[in-house]
Amino acid sequence: MTDIEKQTEIREKKGRNVMRELKIQKLCLNICVGESGDRLTRAAKVLEQLTGQTPVFSKARYTVRTFGIRRNEKIAVHCTVRGPKAEEILEKGLKVKEYELYKENFSDTGNFGFGVQEHIDLGIKYDPGIGIYGMDFYVVLNRNGVRVSKRRRAPGRIGPSHRVDKEETIKWFQQKYDGIILPPKPKTKKNVYRRR
């Protein structure tokens, strides 16, 4: 290797700043059943099969008579996955969506989410005792150095240039997964009643 080749290699390494690279902090999976009981425990089994972790039950915040939900009643189940397992499950979920997401799926803080209609599309074998459930995927992205704002002792602030925004997340999604951003959904007109 000549000196010129070494220098160009060093420049390339410096050009890729490790602190600026986006990474998946966590993947949150959520199944909202809307009622407690047998259906909820079966939904918990689905999440346990998918993640290999014991999921957590979510309670209703307040009573909604029309839905038949009481306050503090367990109505949903969710699970947080991190590391390589999160990337693996996200890959399965995006494969179901054919790597196509809408711009509305991405938030201003650099996170994105989408839904899957049937859990059997993710590669889980169909069990008639469990049934079919849909689920929500929420992906939280961040950069190295976020701990500065989260730590207990001497917390600092992250500058605006280091925060993750919508455009960066979309670019990351397109580069990493060869994702396609679909045009916005056509807005349906709601029934407009005019006074006579």
Swiss-Prot record:
InterPro entries, A to Z: Ribosomal_uL5, Ribosomal_uL5_C, Ribosomal_uL5_CS, Ribosomal_uL5_dom_sf, Ribosomal_uL5_N
GO biological process: translation
Any one of the GO CC terms: cytosolic large ribosomal subunit
Subcellular location: Nucleus; Cytoplasm
Keywords carried by this UniProt record: Cytoplasm, Nucleus, Ribonucleoprotein, Ribosomal protein, RNA-binding, rRNA-binding
Consequences of knocking out this gene: RNAi-mediated knockdown results in sterility and a germ cell proliferation defect.
GO molecular function, one term: rRNA binding
Main localisation: nucleus
Subunit text: Component of the large ribosomal subunit.
Family of the protein in this entry: Belongs to the universal ribosomal protein uL5 family.
Further remarks about this protein from its record: There's a functional difference between the two L11-encoding proteins in C.briggsae. rpl-11.1 plays a role in the germline whereas rpl-11.2 has a somatic function.
Function: Component of the ribosome, a large ribonucleoprotein complex responsible for the synthesis of proteins in the cell. The small ribosomal subunit (SSU) binds messenger RNAs (mRNAs) and translates the encoded message by selecting cognate aminoacyl-transfer RNA (tRNA) molecules. The large subunit (LSU) contains the ribosomal catalytic site termed the peptidyl transferase center (PTC), which catalyzes the formation of peptide bonds, thereby polymerizing the amino acids delivered by tRNAs into a polypeptide chain.
Descriptive protein name: Large ribosomal subunit protein uL5A
